[in-house]
Structure formats: C-alpha cells, structure tokens
Amino acid sequence: MRGAGWWSGRETALLVAIAMAISIAVVALFLVRPWSGAQSGPPRAVIVDQLTSEMPKPPFVEATSSLLEQAGYEVDYYWGEEITVDFYRELPTHGYDLVLLRAHSGLIQGGDRDGEAFLFTGEPYSGSEYLKDQRAGRLLMATYGLGPDPSFELRDLPRYFGIVPDFIESSMMGEFDDTTIVVMGCNGLTSESMAEAFIQKGAKTVVSWDGLVTGDHTDEATERLLQLMLTDGLSMGDAVERTRTEVGPDPWYGSNLLFYPGEEAVSTIP
C-alpha cells in the first residue's frame, strides 16, 4: 500500500499537466481581455447612433454598414437610449478600429471650460446618478433646441447626460488602440479639447466639424469619407480634403470637415 505522501510517475505527470493547463488558461485570459488592445481577426467598427431615438438604422446606417462589411469589417450598432454614460465609459475596452459617433455634440458655455466640446448621451439626466463624475465636473446636463424661441423654456427641453473631455481621459476604461474616431456632430473640432482627449486616450485620428452641422450633411460627408478611404485607399488627409471638395461645407452653417492631429495626414484606417 502506498503512503499518503507517495505519488506514482503517472500521477505526478498528471498533476504537472493540470498545472500547465491552468497556467495556459490564466495566460490566455490576460491575452484576450478586451482592454489589452491586442486582437485577432477582421477589423472592427461601431456606429454609435445617439441621434436616432425611435426607429433604428436610418439610411445612413444601412449604407455605411454595408460599405464597412464589404471592406471586411465586423460592424456593431448601438442607438438611442443604449448610448448611456457607462456605454461611453466602456467604449475603449471593445477593441474597435473605427468609431463613428453619430451623436449630438456642443460647446460648454461659461465657467473654466468655456468653449470645450462635449458629447450627448441618450441617457436622461439625473442629479442622483454618477455622483463622483458629476462632482468632478466630468459630466454635465446637456440640452438642445433649435434656437431662442419664446414658446418654450429651458425646463421644457429634454435633458441628457453629456460627457466632457475630462471624462474621456479620466473616466473611460482602458485605452483605444490607434482607433480612428469620427465625431459626426457639431463643433467637435471648433476647439481641439475633445479631439486631444481622444488622442491622449489612445486614438490615432479624430475627424469632425469646426462648427454647427446639419444631420443630412454630416451623413453624406461621413459616407463619402469612408468610401474614399476604404474603397479608393486614400490617406486620411487626402480623403478629408477630397470630401471637402466634393461634398462642400455645410449648406446652412458653413462648417468644414477637419481632422486632428494634422500630422496624421498620411494615416489610413485598417
């Protein structure tokens, strides 16, 4: 009879094999964790459609998804109330190569951050949620209208959480991995605050507008930009310049499509 402390060669080999399997599994978990930036397989894109609140997948989304899929991308789509504070918080962890932010955006008015850009979520504002971020000034109450109108007051407008550049740098989890980010809403590059925050968070290039922009115009320009880069193989700088020439500035507000930082003119998306 074998003593309690005695192991046969077969049992010893089995224990070693189990230990090795556990070690390999642990290593694998670290290799595939979503915030590592390392990934295999086809490039990935996401369309973040905060503008759509009632009926998902407007024509722009259908056309752009088809264009991306033909170029070999896996495409995810989120819309409306799915675009929460925590959705933005976790966005870098998903390993996207291309992020299309079809979302309202604007400029902070007044205070120390006057003129900084911010992004709308689709999550109704509450003074009792995300208190740490609110107290730190990384979230704000965002609302919008068509302009001064005596028929309504501020309290009558819908209110949403908005995220500011400091939220991108300090509250988003993980890092982007040389991601191209297209901010399709207004004023994304009126100042460089939001774009620089994305760059500091690991993005490669940010594309947006230097003023107000209408929904139809940003849809048309973004679709053409992607065609030029994905189908024609143009660099970011050349594609933006060509889009400006072909599509032109916004017909109502005169805003222009820009990209940041300027030295990324030769970059392409996967």
Descriptions of predicted regions:
Residues 2-21, 30:
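N-terminal Sec-pathway targeting helices
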Residues 7, 82-83, 231-234:
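Short coil/turn linker and secondary-structure boundary residues
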Residues 8, 83-89, 153, 160-165:
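A diffuse structural propensity rather than consistent per-protein peaks
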Residues 27-34:
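Juxtamembrane cytosolic interface motif at the C-terminal end of transmembrane helices
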Residues 34-145:
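A domain-level signal for caspase-like cysteine endopeptidase catalytic cores
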Residues 126-219:
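Catalytic cores of nucleophile-dependent amide-cleaving enzymes
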Residues 179-270:
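Active-site-proximal C-terminal subdomain of hydrolase catalytic domains
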